[in-house]
Amino acid sequence: MAQFVREFKEEDYQDVLHIWDKTDMGGEHRGDDLKIIEDTINFGGKLFVLEDDDHGIIGTSWITNDQRRLYLHHFGILPDYQGKGLSHILMEKCMEFAMDEGLQIKLEVQRTNHTAKALYKKYGFKYLGDYDIYIVRNPEDINLDNL
């Protein structure tokens, strides 16, 4: 059983959605559809997939690029493959991409995900301090009348 990282191809889309569903990372219900993936890739990002020779795609890492920094998200591995050190294969590819681009790389992680936080720290990520992140996921929820 050998694993390797490669770039996303359109025919990977359903497998990627399956991983995102099984790892609670997102999917079409959060706007993570094929068009958005392709747009972010065309704008200098990458979607890497971790593939197993015997079992197909088992992990993903999506990197978007705003031309100032890279954003690492949707980094995850199917539960049956977690705890086997496979995240290092995927993370090394991400960090190589950041070095090649010469851009800083940033990510968000749930406070309770201690395993992921330990991995990120091993690769040099630093905690930025106590600040909260807010988002409006649905533009229809924007209400300027209350201002």
Name these PLM-found stretches.
Residues M1-E11, E140-L147:
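Conserved N-terminal entry element of GNAT/NAT acetyltransferase domains
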Residues Q3, E7-H74, L78, M91-E92, ...:
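Acetyl-CoA-dependent GNAT
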Residues D52-H55, D80-Y81, R137-D141:
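Short loop segments at secondary-structure junctions
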Residues I77, G83-E96, A118, K122:
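Conserved acetyl-CoA-binding loop-helix of GNAT-fold acetyltransferases
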Residues A98-V109:
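Conserved GNAT acetyl-CoA-binding A-motif
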Residues L107-K117, I135-P139:
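Conserved beta-strand-loop-alpha-helix junction that forms the acyl-donor binding cleft
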Residues K122, K126, I133-L147:
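Terminal substrate-recognition subdomain of acyl/acetyltransferases
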